[in-house]
Amino acid sequence: MELNLSEPGQSRYLRVYEYYKELIGSGQMKPGAKLPSIRKCSLQLQLSRTTVETAYMLLAADGYIISRPQSGFYVTDAVLAAANREEIEHGVPHQEERPEIRYDFASSNVDRESFQFDLWRRYVKSALRQDERLLSYGEPQGEREFREALCAYLGRHRNVICTPDSIVVGAGVQSLLHILCPMLRERDSAWFFNPSFRQGRQIFEDYGFRTGDIREYWENNDRRIESSKKGLFGIEKPDVCATEMKTGLSEQMSEAMRHTGKSVCYLTPSQMTVWGEVMPVGDRMKLLKDAAREDMLIIEDDYNSEFRYYNRPTPSLQGLSGGRGVVYLGTFSRLLLPSIRMSYMVLPPDLLKRYQERGRFYNQTASKAEQIALCQFIRDGHLESQIRKSKKLYAAKAKCLCDAVRRIFGEKARTHLGDAGFLVLMELDSPLTSAEIAGRAAQAGVAVRPVESVGSLLEKQEHHFQEGYPKLLLSCASMGAERYEEALEVLKEVVYKKEK
């Protein structure tokens, strides 16, 4: 670029500015290069010192050069950052727009009809009127009154053994795991039975834990299969003798833990699969016995425990253990609204002592106003009423979805209902894979979740899953039941359009 000062139309200081800006931006002047002094530049260009000084000040203001006292002006490293920023802002590849989803069978949202917004609004307004309480920060462990209400509720409904002092409140399970993991330094590995909670697993990895999948370990380390049979959880195990018990989670876990030292086991016994299989009491007791023998800490995420449609809720592992050796986690995201970020953790005595030594260093992440509101909401009995209403609604919607599948697909599809949760498993008679169907459905505006293998499902005797048949998980939660049939008609067209 040549500096032309004779053309009219632009101030001379701007031309000097543009000239050096181009030299620096193009790399002809490298970071650290020295510019001519103001006096020398004014002589070379035959300009006044004021004109050159103004141009230099503008370059410095924009980050291209820096003034060093008693030394002069130098090109800055910020130029490289500016170039990188421009490349990032303008060089990002165009992302293909996703198709609009009209029918959402994959959402984890809740049904609007399941929640009494006006009632909750009343409790929030009442909490916001407590001016004096809201002028201070919340208690690091959670508001005392809220923990007292939680303690009473958990004891009544989940047989959890706790006191208000053993409960820690946080904004979501992940925030609580960030408190828990540093207290488990003597344990070096964390095992997960259900790999779908990737966010939790990532936190353990971030804190240096080796993580593994119990099911995968079992399958990769037992190659002695001669005559085999399906175990209680769908895992093949050698038939050592004719009277051998079916292989359950406890056996799989004990075998894995026996070779890994002091470990942590993270599981959701009230929803062992995404579609709602529940760990039986017998397996829970066996697991607790083996965990005590192997010095294994269990983290029980009691997700969706309230949503047992057809049977009474199974007692929590924490309660069955007598309150020792188990960390109990719970959340209100499904019972209330996902946007109400309120979770809680019940610590066993040994970990509670550690928390009390360092708990003051943690700030409370959950809203103080929402804790106050939810405390009174629970005390007035509305949480239990909310559970009854939600269970009735989602049980009816799940049945409605199964009926709609039968009407639309006939003998070309089968449905399976789990013991809990919001999902219906659908098996299709089609040569397409689950992923292919999900991809085509998305293009047609229908969101579904593919299931790639029977191994990811816990198999009960009443369910006979077929290998080779595509399987989809359909959520009955967020979409209105009146739209099920029209959505399934679109899905059927996607699956069988080649057969016409």
Predicted regions mapped to residue ranges:
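N-terminal basic, amphipathic alpha-helical segments
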Residues: 1-125, 132-135, 148, 231-237, ...
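Short glycine/serine/threonine/alanine-rich loop segments
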Residues: 47, 64, 209, 296, ...
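Active-site PLP attachment segment
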Residues: 70, 319-354
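Short glycine-rich anion-binding loops that position phosphate/pyrophosphate groups of nucleotides
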Residues: 110, 269-272, 334, 479
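Conserved core of the PLP fold type I
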Residues: 134-294, 299, 305-307, 312-324, ...
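Short beta-strand "wing" residues that participate in macromolecule-binding interfaces
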Residues: 66-68, 162, 448
